Amino acid sequence: MTYSVSPSSLLTEYGNDNICRVLALDGGGAKGFYTLGVLKEIEAMLGCPLYKRFDLVFGTSTGAIIAALIALGYEVDQIHALYTEHVPRVMSSRSAAARTMALQDLAKEVFQDKTFEDVLMGIGIVATRWMTERPMIFKGNVVQAHGRKGTFSPGFGVSIADAVQASCSAYPFFERKVIVTAAGDKVELIDGGYCANNPTLFAIADATVALKKDHKDIRVINVGVGIYPEPKPGLLMRIAKKWLAVQLLQKTLEINTQSMDQLRDILFKDIPTIRISDTFERPEMATDLLEYNLDKLNTLRQRGRESFGAREAQLREFLI
């Protein structure tokens, strides 16, 4: 199937007011349905595709998929349709090799031959270098570079499909992703959540250092995936080591997320920021990053829309 951006019915236009609006999207696997619920309401409030109102979009893992599609001009309903079609197939696969193949097929089918030269806004896709244990952030414009501008290549010369797959490669549940840069360097990558499951700090670094925006002229919207009870393991999952590994991965990513947000609050308290990622404690909300039940995923999306409602007035002040 060929995917393309449909003509938009969202026609509101905004003038340039010198405010740098930043959208940062957390990782969290299938729980990205919550993110889509929040973004659907933001898009409807704005009356225009998100790329037309935000200057920068950064994403990690599931947030990287959404960020890349936003930057290519997709509207939220189109992204939701893609998630509904593909996420259950990827997450229901029974092995790392099968999940990796399903993720690779998804990335190639959706992004095709798109490169970082095709994006319509500033973008950052966060992955983690396996060997050197450092972040690798794929960007589209040399103005976002913090150095080595003379050799800058959009997205390091890597396709969007490969960059997004790397950002989503939650090892050991997915295999590591090997990419080859425009310089001919072979790099082995894993999920960006291992270094910045919440990519807000990297986005603020671009806005303040690379783009040289004053703190007072920046507005940050950081959308998480929500916090949920752990699902009760079935008999087979109790026996298998997989259940403990899922718990450990989720805990690692959540600690990373909260640490990055706390650090952001300390270092950049003067930059107006709204974080949306509510906690849901009812037992029926139990889920994890490998969820593939569409009824449960639709419930997460509904919760995301409700989370928007609790902050609508502040979001309107930031964005309109």
UniProtKB/Swiss-Prot annotation:
Q: Which GO terms describe its cellular component?
A: membrane
Report the residue ranges where the short sequence motif GXGXXG is annotated in this entry. Answer: 27-32
Keyword annotations from UniProtKB, A to Z: Antiviral defense, Hydrolase, Lipid degradation, Lipid metabolism
GO molecular function list? phospholipase A1 activity
Q: State any GO BP term from the record.
A: lipid catabolic process
User: Which Enzyme Commission number(s) are listed?
Assistant: 3.1.1.32
Q: Which residue positions are annotated as catalytic?
A: S61, D191
Sequence motif: DGA/G, positions: 191-193
Q: Specify one Pfam family.
A: Patatin
Catalytic reaction annotation: a 1,2-diacyl-sn-glycero-3-phosphocholine + H2O = a 2-acyl-sn-glycero-3-phosphocholine + a fatty acid + H(+)
Q: Ranges for the PNPLA domain?
A: 23-204
User: In chain numbering, where does the motif GXSXG fall?
Assistant: 59-63
How does its record describe regulation of its activity? Answer: Phospholipase activity is specifically activated upon 3',3'-cUAMP binding. Is not activated by the other cyclic dinucleotides 3',3'-cGAMP, 3',3'-c-diAMP and 3',3'-c-diGMP. Therefore, is specifically activated by only the nucleotide synthesized from its adjacently encoded nucleotidyltransferase (CdnE).
Known function: Effector phospholipase of a CBASS antivirus system. CBASS (cyclic oligonucleotide-based antiphage signaling system) provides immunity against bacteriophage. The CD-NTase protein synthesizes cyclic nucleotides in response to infection; these serve as specific second messenger signals. The signals activate a diverse range of effectors, leading to bacterial cell death and thus abortive phage infection. A type II-A(UA) CBASS system. Phospholipase that is activated upon binding to the cyclic dinucleotide (CDN) second messenger 3',3'-cyclic UMP-AMP (3',3'-cUAMP).
Record-stated family: Belongs to the patatin family.
Extra information: This is a complex CBASS locus with the loci capE-cdnE-probable diadenylate cyclase-capV-dcnV1-cap2-cap3.
Q: Which PANTHER family match?
A: CALCIUM-INDEPENDENT PHOSPHOLIPASE A2-GAMMA
Tell me the protein's name: cUMP-AMP-activated phospholipase
Q: Which organism is it from?
A: Escherichia coli
